Amino acid sequence: MSNTLYFDVKGNSMFPTFKDGDSICFEKFNHHRIEVNDIIVCKHPFKTDFNIIKRVTKIKEKKLFIEGDNKEISSSEDSHNFGYINTNKVIAIKRN
């Protein structure tokens, strides 16, 4: 079984790292260590069946603060909107 997962970028929250329409290869998350600056795919904390791609910018007591790379405030729905997320929301990871 492959540990590789592909996700399509929708929107510009991760610009300039990823652009709308990019297909990005991630490693399936198997509860290995997450570090600041890793890019993750996770389940949205409040929207059912909705995944988001974000960068981990802070880790506090095994919870993650995630942000989009696009610095325009309105471009990203992230931890600024919903706070820290639990690692059980993480689906896949891309190391930097």
Predicted feature residues:
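Extended hydrophobic leader/signal-anchor segments used for secretion and membrane insertion
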Residues: 1-96
